[in-house]
A protein has these predicted regions:
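Short glycine-rich, low-complexity segments
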Residues: 317, 330-334
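Proteins enriched for Cys/Gly/acidic motifs involved in redox and nucleic-acid/cofactor modification
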Residues: 1-194, 233, 248, 270-281, ...
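Contiguous mid-protein beta-loop-alpha structural module that forms a pocket-lining wall or clamp
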Residues: 299, 315-316
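Terminal RNA-binding accessory module
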Residues: 334-425
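Conserved, mostly hydrophobic/aromatic
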Residues: 151, 171, 188, 222, ...
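Short, solvent-exposed loop/turn segments at secondary-structure boundaries
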Residues: 50-52, 162-169, 197-202, 262-265, ...
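Conserved SAM/AdoMet-binding glycine-rich loop
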Residues: 70-71, 79-82, 180-301
Length: 425
């Protein structure tokens, strides 16, 4: 039987889907990106739009694949536990993803809908371990699940539960296996990655110290980390280990202290700026990307301008801009002075323009420099990949995928760099 996974949302979902596919593959099922006998839909619910997108995918699959087994799982289910999904074979939240093959095989015997949802999450990490990823040149490794920050706009602590960390020995073994299988870059993922270890008497920096010792690992990337987790121990690890790439994604969410307080973020802008300055003392050319929510309740034009000016001051490489999305069950949903949609859209556009200008300025600083590029694909006569600081580079000619090569940057084409392969370096 053929199995296909459709993954929405974050890198954690991507990792979990890869793990589930590997379990099916081990049982003799065929993995496909085409028409399948079994569909796995790993949903997202971080915004109303992602929730609606998940529902749309499910309804289309049910309509077009009446004889297939359809499994729906993840955050959208956790956020809507009473949801009715006619035509869906198996409905689970985030707790039993490791049991999907077992559930599918039980369904194939009796053809009765399986629905496994719980009021509480387990206190321990649901172990998953992968050795390969389908069609990828960097491997994701999930080290943590859950979040306890309870930002006023966010549903995720309710859909993912409290922080649970993977055993550090398991993390090391998994990454070692992936490196032996040819992966040069590993990305550490989690719902709140920097809180790794808070439940098992260790810490994220302690884990990093062990990972960087793995022989053959050329690049270690952190998918996202909060500014409050960039403590002296972390900064010291970053300073002394070049295998950790010069790219950090640090969510800002707002550049107005008033809005940060309403969001229940754990810092204000002076703290954020101080940490960024310390990072740049260690890695002057580091790429810092971020997330910003615009149109949060009570956000005035002055508040929004504070955000624009702060982003310019930090000089982010790229800003992922999101209009505020009301989520039932969060404190922000009950706040007064909700911002009209037309104002949100206008602010999104303005901040994206700021982001594009900052990104171009950063990209231009690499013209005439030599950089290392992990080749990921060959397309239209070019080899395409990313630098350690996650800049997209294209090089004329075919270079073998999964190689890290030296490239001299010649020019910028909009938001991409164009370079020349330096064979002798």
């Amino acid at each position: 039987m053929k199995v296909r996974a459709i993954t929405l949302g974050c890198k954690v979902n991507t990792y979990e889907s890869e793990y589930i596919l590997s379990c099916f593959k081990d049982k003799g099922y065929e993995i496909t990106n085409d028409i399948a006998d079994i569909y796995i839909v790993n949903t997202c619910s971080v915004t109303n739009m992602s929730d609606a997108k998940s529902r749309k995918v499910i309804h289309r699959l049910v309509r077009e694949n009446k004889n297939s087994v359809i499994v729906v799982m993840g955050c959208m289910i956790e956020a809507n536990k009473d949801i009715k999904l006619d035509g869906v074979s198996i409905i689970i939240g985030n707790k039993d993803k490791a049991k999907v093959v077992e559930l599918v095989e039980a369904y194939l015997k009796d053809r009765e809908q399986k629905r496994l949802l719980y009021e509480n999450f387990d206190s321990t990490f649901e172990d998953m371990f992968i050795t390969n990823m389908e069609s990828r040149h960097r491997a994701f490794v999930k080290i943590e699940d859950g979040c306890e920050n309870f930002c006023s706009y966010c549903i995720i602590p309710y859909t993912r539960g409290r922080v649970r960390s993977k055993n550090p020995d398991t993390v090391i073994k998994e990454i070692t296996t992936l490196v032996k299988n040819g992966y040069k870059e590993v990305v550490l993922t989690g719902i709140h990655t920097g809180h790794y270890g808070s439940d098992i008497e260790t810490s994220f920096p302690e884990l990093l110290k062990e990972i960087v010792k793995i022989e053959g690992l050329e690049r270690l990337r952190i998918s996202s980390i909060e500014i409050t987790e960039l403590n002296d121990e972390f900064l010291n690890v970053l300073k002394n280990n070049s295998v950790i790439v010069s790219h950090l994604h640090i969510p800002l969410q707002a550049g107005s202290d008033k809005i940060l307080t309403l969001m229940n973020r754990k810092y204000l802008t002076p703290y954020f700026l101080d940490k960024v300055e310390k990072i740049r003392e260690i890695r002057p050319d580091i790429s810092l990307t971020t997330d910003v929510i615009v149109g949060f309740p009570k956000e005035t034009e002055e508040d929004f301008l504070d955000t624009i000016n702060f982003c310019k001051k930090i000089k982010f490489t790229k800003i992922h801009v999101f209009p505020y999305s009301r989520r039932k069950g969060t404190k922000a949903d009950l706040m007064d002075e909700q911002i009209p949609e037309n104002i949100k859209k206008e602010r999104v556009k303005r901040l994206i323009d700021v982001s594009n200008n900052l990104e171009k300025e950063y990209l231009d600083s690499f013209i005439s420099k030599t950089v290392s590029v992990l080749i990921e694909e060959n397309k239209d006569g070019y080899s395409i990949g990313h630098t350690g600081n996650y800049l997209k580079v294209k090089i004329l000619g075919d270079i073998k995928a999964n190689e890290i090569v030296s490239v001299k940057i010649k020019e910028r084409e909009n938001l991409e760099l164009v370079g020349e392969y330096e064979k002798d370096k």
